[in-house]
Amino acid sequence: MLLIAVVGVRTFSQTSAPTATKSAKVEAGSEACSSCHSEIYKSYSKTVMANASGLAGDGLITGEFNDKTSGVHYRVYKQDDHVWMSYDRESEKFRGQRELSYFIGSGRKGRSYLFSVQGFLFETPINWYSQENRWEMTPAYAEAREIPMNLPAFMDCMNCHSSGLQPPIAGTDNKFSGAPFLHGGITCERCHGAGEGHGASSANSPSVGSSSGNVSTVYSSSGNSSIVNPAKLPADRRDAICMECHFEGTVAVDQPGKHLYQFQPGERLSDYIHYFLLSGNQPETPQALSQVEALSLSECKRRSGDRMWCGSCHDPHAEPAAEEKAAYYRSKCLNCHGEAFATKHHPDKTDCTKCHMPALPSKDVAHTEGTDHRIRRYPNTRPLPQLQVRGTPGAPLVSFPKSDASLATTRDFALAWETLAQRNVEGASQVAEEYLREAVKEQGDDPVLLASLGFVEQKHGHEKEARDLYERVLKLDPLANDAATDLGILEARSGNLRGAVELWQGAFNRVPYRSAVGMNLALAFCVAGQTDVARKFVQRVLEFNPDYFKGKQLQAHLGEKPVQCTP
């Protein structure tokens, strides 16, 4: 039997019980603040953050385009109060459509849309890019010859574009019992904490953000939440509020039992996630979500230390008009550099950012430009310093920020290197194996560690060791889909097709959009002579991924006589 390999890409599904959503409607989460903070509410409601997501029909960007590589024509349109994305390939008389539910992205730089299939949430394969005024394929799929229709909507993306993000149903990554998020855009509470009871308790609440750094100061003694003022928090907790979404790093490792969307203002971000960078990994173009990293490399930040943060230059409640930007940001520069400096330093040029923070092509977001927060002197005569915090043997992986270096555990480094091994970084799998073995000795009941070590062992051809590790994972977490599918591959290779099918069926029932798993089931039943069952699995694959070539080909072969069990 020809297996459609599934080992190599690992995701860790939500296994905790989901919290029920309040409504199938996206609510306006900041309106409750408007009665007391009307001017701030008015200005903030016009910002990019406030409009980062919402219902698909709100501010709908319609249009169409032809993808030359796949030969597919896409169209986004509204009909009878419903928003649709249609697709068709005239050469095959192949066509279909998906109803769009939500948008992601304010439209300032771009926008994508989300749609649901049987409760699973996916991202459209096309994006709108405002700076070039055109539709294009989603990043990484520009050369795709098939429609990538089964792209799961990632929690991290939704977390940084919405508020009130709900946990997915246990055993899945992108299936929700109701609305995936309760509020469109970034609401007041995302930066200021829960506002429930704020009006009644504020007079009796203790001062928020005391210098003690104790998280308990964020909440009143009565149990009601008091509002967090980020500027008054200790520097690490202040910066964490922005860093949650404006820092990407090379690798991010969730802490045990924690997820980034659970983070609350005033808490330590390192309690939820640990970031790593490859030292010296400084591209000439700024990464779309790594403004914090770029700023840390600047002379301004290194000399100012904790006194300088995002709020030193940015007003989170308002955005200056286009004609006011130069003067606005110049005033921020002069807060430190002073008018006397300005009279001597190119007095004829009033836009500091044009030279020192220019817009450059973005590395991670196609067809867009981003502001270079490295605040460099052009032409640059000195190389920027490399980040050196805590290195690892064999490769320059370091913790970020520097204050978190002592908090990084063996588990953190192990999972970081395993992620790099997935990306086929040279030498990463060997370093990952070393760290993972050490981490498993320390925490032998951690299913994430065991699954990661299983992946590395399988990558190195150590199938017996990998099988033992996957079995341990599934005893601890029966909903671990990656361990189940990869163990299924090993069982099939050893001749235990019945055991493989049982493992694959469990995983495919939970995540039916994973085409490779469904195809393996179809092939297994085809080989066993159960072609009717095989057809059902192929049809299930095509429900989520209708342009999947191997699926369409196997579907055709299953209708031939004699039947061919090959994709």
Give the ranges of each region predicted by the language model.
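Helix-start (N-cap) detector for alpha-helical repeat units in TPR-like alpha-solenoids
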Residues: D446-V448, N481-D482, R514-A516, F549-K550
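Structural marker of alpha-solenoid helical repeat scaffolds
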Residues: E442, L476, N509-V511, F544
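Primarily the internal scaffold of c-type cytochrome electron-transfer domains
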Residues: T15-S16, A24, E31, E39-S106, ...
